[in-house]
């Protein structure tokens, strides 16, 4: 069996949803394993896919709920529940014809109802009523949606989505969008069965398999916090002949033991393994597996750091008085200070903690989306954005937005931007050094190393008399409660 497997090397970031869905839609492969076993890093806090777009939720939902369209392995949009669609001449109305006979199932595999056009109307209404964090992508696109979300209208029938009949769903847009179909692949646009939604009430979408319905290639069989997530192939799936993996088991991995991934792979417990060039067993693994170690292509997902410019909670902080809190807030609201931080971050060193020196540049991205994400006339998004950057000052002239190289890091530019910021901030009574709290999960070895790398590059570029990065190590739950899973702004 081992000879049939491949190790995934230092340049890869695995997403269970994308990997498993790709397996489910792959071409026939007689050697493909019938069970896929690997790891996951974060429990989903909710399965209410219409309302949350968190990756921990999306990783699950991508394998269990189908929408109108999906992407093939090349990124092309292809039919899923919509077997055909058309666009009006003015580009404002998109009409999708649904497959007949596609069913909703419970987590136990019991047939619940047929998937119908009204389910897509219900899904969008549930997203709007639940103030979904994915609405920003849609509210200016779909006619009447922004007014409904803001409360200007309380009549959802004025929103540009309707079930023409049981198998035809229609969307009306505010203006033509040539890229509209890419939006229907988002979780906010997935169908929801109204009867089931109402029957579950507040329990709908809680992180238990029975809280949602399934129409996709897999059924979620178990979800045990910080332990395991298990799926089984949906035997009644409309496209079951193209689902090649029968069962999936993902075991929780907290990042504390890098060597455990390759150990489990070697022992046959995992189907694949993420390798860390900084781990103690990397060289011996290279000798054993040789050319079976590969770098994956850079994926479309972007990971980025953000700053909290309106912090309200200080339950976890290194700050010792109110003056430090006020000074930090003023600094983060200052454009030149933020630019100084941007230029001071050594991205190559940061990613090398994960991928080693050889693979560090393979995952560097210099813009929020890939530079060639969209074409506008003869130019890519990256080319257009790069031309616009120059208008922000000469410091951006030599910054390239292509992937694979850190073109932003420059201690010299950081110092220039910081000097401007310091003058502006001192005029407001801000005191230095500015203290920046950065929370990190204490058991995640790589995350701690990356955060320390960030601290080193910023402090060496700007000077500790000016900026101090305070690394706050804490548990996974503590970190999530003040960041991505904070329930209200006052907790952040």
PLM segments and residue spans:
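C-terminal motif of bacterial Sec signal peptides marking the signal peptidase cleavage site
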Residues: 19-22
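N-terminal lobe/hinge region of extracytoplasmic solute-binding protein
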Residues: 39-89, 213
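Aromatic- and charge-enriched surface segment that lines or borders ligand/interaction sites
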Residues: 83-137, 264, 327-333, 338-340
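Extracellular/periplasmic solute-recognition and catalytic clefts
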Residues: 221-235, 251-320, 348, 352-357
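Periplasmic binding protein-like
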Residues: 38, 263-267, 292, 457-492
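Gly/Pro-rich hinge or "lid" segments in bacterial periplasmic/extracellular proteins
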Residues: 156, 167, 173-249, 260
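Append "and occasionally in soluble cytosolic enzymes with long acidic Gly/Pro-rich linkers
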Residues: 332-460
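Surface-exposed binding/hinge segments that line
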Residues: 97, 119, 126-196
């Amino acid at each position: 069996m081992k000879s049939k497997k491949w190790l995934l090397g230092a340049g890869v970031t695995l997403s269970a949803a994308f990997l498993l869905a790709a397996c489910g839609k792959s071409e026939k492969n007689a050697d493909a394993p019938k069970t896929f076993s690997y790891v996951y890093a974060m429990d989903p806090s909710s399965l209410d896919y219409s309302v949350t777009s968190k990756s921990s939720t999306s990783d699950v939902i991508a394998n269990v709920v189908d929408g109108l369209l999906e992407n093939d392995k090349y990124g092309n949009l292809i039919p899923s529940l919509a077997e055909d669609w058309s666009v009006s001449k003015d580009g404002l109305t998109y009409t999708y014809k649904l497959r007949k006979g596609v069913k909703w199932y419970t987590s136990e595999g019991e047939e619940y109802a047929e998937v119908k056009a009204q389910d897509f109307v219900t899904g969008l209404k549930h997203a709007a009523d639940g103030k979904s964090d994915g609405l920003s992508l849609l509210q200016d696109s779909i006619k009447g949606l922004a007014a409904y979300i803001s409360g200007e209208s309380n009549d959802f029938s004025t929103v540009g989505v309707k079930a023409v009949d049981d198998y035809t769903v229609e969307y009306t847009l505010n203006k033509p969008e040539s890229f509209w179909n890419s939006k229907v692949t988002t979780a906010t646009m997935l169908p929801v069965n109204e009867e089931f939604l109402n029957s579950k009430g507040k329990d709908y979408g809680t992180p238990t398999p029975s809280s949602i319905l399934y129409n996709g290639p897999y059924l979620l069989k178990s979800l045990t916090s910080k332990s395991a997530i298990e799926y089984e192939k949906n035997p009644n799936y409309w496209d079951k002949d193209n689902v090649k993996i029968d069962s999936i088991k993902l075991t929780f991995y907290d990042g504390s033991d890098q060597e455990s991934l390759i150990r489990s792979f070697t022992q046959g417990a995992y189907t694949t393994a993420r390798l860390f060039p900084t781990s103690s067993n990397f060289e011996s693994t290279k000798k054993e597996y040789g050319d079976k170690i590969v770098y994956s292509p850079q994926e479309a997902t972007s990971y980025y750091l953000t700053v909290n410019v309106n912090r309200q909670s200080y339950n976890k902080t290194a700050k010792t008085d109110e003056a430090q809190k006020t000074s930090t807030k003023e600094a983060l609201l200052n454009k030149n200070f933020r630019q100084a931080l941007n230029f001071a971050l050594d991205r190559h060193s940061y990613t090398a903690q994960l991928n080693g020196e050889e693979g560090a540049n393979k995952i560097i991205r210099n813009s929020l989306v890939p530079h060639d994400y969209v074409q506008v006339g003869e130019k890519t998004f990256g080319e257009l954005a790069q031309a616009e950057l120059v208008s922000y000052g000469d410091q951006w002239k030599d910054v390239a937005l292509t992937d694979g190289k850190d073109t932003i890091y420059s201690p010299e530019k950081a110092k220039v931007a910081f000097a401007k910021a310091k003058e502006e901030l001192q005029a407001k009574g801000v005191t230095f050094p500015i203290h920046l709290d950065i929370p990190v999960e204490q058991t995640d070895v790589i995350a701690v190393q990356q955060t320390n790398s960030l601290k080193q590059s910023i402090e060496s570029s700007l000077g500790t008399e000016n900026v101090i990065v305070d690394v706050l190590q804490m548990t996974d739950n503590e970190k999530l409660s003040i960041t991505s899973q904070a329930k209200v702004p006052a907790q952040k």
